[in-house]
UniProtKB/Swiss-Prot annotation:
InterPro entries, A to Z: DNA_pol3_alpha_NTPase_dom (IPR011708), DNA_pol3_alpha_thumb_dom (IPR041931), DNA_pol3_finger (IPR040982), DnaE2/DnaE/PolC (IPR004805), DNAPol_HHH (IPR029460), NA-bd_OB_tRNA (IPR004365), PHP_dom (IPR004013), Pol/His_phosphatase_N (IPR003141)
Gene3D superfamilies, sorted: 1.10.150.870, Bacterial DNA polymerase III alpha subunit, thumb domain, Metal-dependent hydrolases
Cellular component terms (Gene Ontology): cytoplasm
Entry keyword annotation includes NAD: no
Compartment(s): Cytoplasm
Principal EC category: transferase
Annotated protein name in UniProt: DNA polymerase III subunit alpha
Catalytic activity reported: DNA(n) + a 2'-deoxyribonucleoside 5'-triphosphate = DNA(n+1) + diphosphate
Pfam families, per the entry: DNA_pol3_alpha (PF07733), DNA_pol3_finger (PF17657), HHH_6 (PF14579), PHP (PF02811), tRNA_anti-codon (PF01336)
Keywords: Cytoplasm, DNA replication, DNA-directed DNA polymerase, Nucleotidyltransferase, Transferase
Keyword Amino-acid biosynthesis included in the entry's annotation: no
UniProt EC number: 2.7.7.7
Amino acid sequence: MESVHIHVHSEYTLLSSMCRIPALVEKAKAAQFSALALTDRHVMYGAVPFYKACKESGLKPIIGMETTVRFAEDRESDLLLYARSNKGYEHLLKLSTIIQCREEKEKYVTWEELLAYKDDLLYVIPYSGGFVRACLEDEALERGERFIQFLKDHLGGESVYLEIQGTDRSKVEPINQLAAKLAIPLVCSQHIQVLEREDLDAWKVIQAIREGVLVEELRIEQEEDVCFFTLTEMEQTFRAYPEALQNTKKLADRCHVELTLGKPRLPKFQTPNEQSAEDYLRKLCEQGAKERYGEEWTKEKAQRLGEELAVIERMGFSDYFLIVWDFMRFAREASIVTGPGRGSVAGSLVAYVLFITDVDPLHYDLLFERFLNPERISLPDIDLDFPDHRREEVIVYVKKKYGANRVAQILTFGTLAARASVRDVGKALAIPPNVIEKISKEISGRPGMTLVKAYNENERLRQLVHASDEAQKVMKLARKVEGLPRHTSTHAAGVVISEQPLTEVIALQHGQGEVPLTQGTMETVEDVGLIKMDFLGLRNLTLLEMVVKRVRETYGHSLNVKQLPLNDAKTFALLAKGETTGVFQLESGGMRKVLRELKPNTFADIVAVNALYRPGPMEFIPDYIQGKEGTKEITYLHPDLEPILSSTYGVIVYQEQIMQIAAKMAGFSLGEADLLRRAISKKKGEALRQQEEAFVTGAVRQGYEQETAKKIYELIVRFANYGFNKSHAVAYSMLAYQLAYLKAHYPSSFYAALASTIWNQPEKLERLLQEMKQQGIRVLPPSLSKSDIHFSEEEEGVRFPLLPLRYVSVRAIRELIKARREAPVRSLFDLCSRVDGRIVTSRVMESLIKAGALDELGERATLLANIEEAFQFAEQVKEFQENTGGLFQLSVEEPEYIKVEPLTDLEKLAYEKEAVGFYLSGHPLLAYTESLRQYDRLTYLEGTERRFVKLAGMIHRIRRIRTKRGEVMGFLTMSDETGEWEAVVFPAVWAMYEWGLKEGELYFVEGKMDRGRSEELQLLVDKVLPLKHMLKKEKEKLFLKITADVEKEVERLNDIRRLLQVHHGPTPVVMYYEKQRKTIQLPEKYHVSLSFTLLHELEQLVGKEHVVVSTYEDES
């Protein structure tokens, strides 16, 4: 008997179902169902993907939704809603939007809201969560009958069904009788959330994760009820209710939804005076052309503009361009900095004269066809950059312009990633945290990592998994839940604008700001035909804006970064030295190396290096550099290639060059050339053959030799995957150049602004401040009277602000600034009496003192000792002023400071690190500068010019990894007074020294300087010794206790001696013989080099508790 599954939750009922839509549809198809429903709870996330998957598989999609209907404050019931038609589908979208846009945490639709959209829907009162079953369980049969009759009266007698589930006849039969009595059709179902029974354990885990409980704490009635049943299983389970089975098919037959997918729904722009969009766009372009070019506007340029406009009009995109022009105009008028362009749109002259982009495509030989190809109808893709702190303003403007119901941001899903799935599964199963932590530490957090990949790559992970049954269970279940959606998030850039209310095509939900989110990802948005625009928040534009503002305020220079000279020697000198921290796209170690080798001296060099510095084309960077230097002869397969490739020294760098070659040599239009480029880049055999034939035939027709044409085609094929979009490269290189110019000419302003963008990232901030010092820019300490919220410039240097200090909030800083503006602060007592103690608390005051911000009020130890008394004094002052209504000023003599011993330099530094996260006024190593001279120690800065070095520094971070061979090695982040570096400790050296390494301690290291994969300098360590052992002559001794049992075994004693000799080194060994009560220091030949390997092997021989390393003072 044919039936249909009508109660199905997919993965989009978050953390409730194991049913991924492709597998769900495949399972239903394989089980020979003719139709399938989707009824996710409250949401329509999966409607379009489900519809597409069903259509592709030949299944009829039944689109529904499960929700809670609230009839009154104390009465509600779950209902299953199904779209009978496209109108019904639209009603589901609207109802889901109402539910998901509620302010309350509870999700429901009111009865009145449901009535507003009741038409074209079918309704099922579900077995679980339905009011009827609750009434039956409470023996309130009449209430249940009245409820059903109420629904029939208001929703339509033929539109309401009653659901039964499960095999318990005692629970199902009363519902059957009730249905018969009220003449309401009965339907039977599985509440499907699991496709395979073996996935039930994983299903329980995600329920536990969602509820925040342990699996063993879950209360599940009939777990079989959530499993996917075949047609036969459904027939067997509900054989007593054949009509209920048939009714599922009848319900499905009543549903007819046909979605229109892939058809663009272009929004309309309201033009003035009822002009057509085409006429208005043309008028704006003509005005913009005059502004951009003035007297330089020529017939050729006008022809290019006309051709572009003709394509835009023919493709129906005039409104689109006007919409983008309008909000870019708003951004300019609101003084919001905009990026020069992004992607292929920079190749459009229309975009340039409309001030959408700031890259002249004619000057840089950019192609419009790379953006909009008349030979290939596709939607335009204009991505726009704004400062990250002002992006929201533009989106809000768009919302107000087109209506709150026509603009939305795009949703994304956060999924259970590899490492997170292990942790969540482990927690749900109550596995000991240390077991889970060991496993998860071995799983890389890099993007794209999966548990299968991690398991295959990491031998240590495999060992841990196989070490226990519980570890294997965790891994098995984690692999099943991995990748399931866990929560919703907002796409970093995507915004949709619709001509019609969005809820006619897609459901919405609450977003983070004023603009809602689509209930569908980017793919779904495109499927339903909505036009996406990317509004990107770019931190580098924020930095640019900040630097320009500081330059104006500090130097009185009003810079227009869009009019900077592109041949500035100072800028290119900075780039040639690779000093590009903070410079967009040029910051990485590898890029700095390339810049140092290339020594760019034209803007075109920056564009080329931006295009080439990627996996694949990087191999051609040496060719480009040698061609530029003239150390390698540049050859061309044909002289006609020279005009196209000479600017890149014979290397095909850009996709546009491929298009130009095809146009020049094969007679292709630029649109056809773009199709060739796209086809070749996919590297599909048949397409490659077809394109080769077309290219060679065209080239021969143009008068080229067939053999030459074939060779040139082969060249194109070789570079097709490597070629970069030149329009994008030029646009982003423009921003890079602007930042480099500002850094070269206004370094203090640049560094102050850059530091202000990373004030809450201590590690990055510390490195940046060290670089500033190396560049000769003084970093002035925090100061109550001079510091601001962010970094500020002074004549002597850049002033450290108050915001990075621990516990110091913006409110507290404003309170402090207000106090100092009223009058100079005389003392700690004076300061406490003039600020609000609820905002500037004793904890805030302590942080200020420890960081040195209150040094102008006294010595740090003294100030710390007087905090409590200062706040008590402040209370007395404020109490008097309150009692007198502020009519009198209290003239009370401030108490004397409690006198204490001043802090030592090392104590000051320790307090600074506590308050700021790193050392501000110096480095602990400075105290040992003289003592270290005898060891030929170099500073890090001196060491960068040498190969073999001896350095001293503090270890800030220790990172331990396991190699592919399973050996352990480490990476140390170290610093001295001149900079920070990474030290690499390979397995053999690590085994010797790991035991003595601690974060926050000073060490003496020997090794060789080398450039790693990122081209950053790093130290390959040969030796690492604690500094205190070297300078204080503090030495270590190894103590071994030989018990009576061990002493009896001569062979074991011989093993100990052999082991000591194998690990010969400087550390003395002392043996205590328990039976004889005798202590003996072994001769020098038994002295050892301490390592984990040695200690572990000794523990095996004499017992862990009988191996002790201790320190002693060497008097010699």
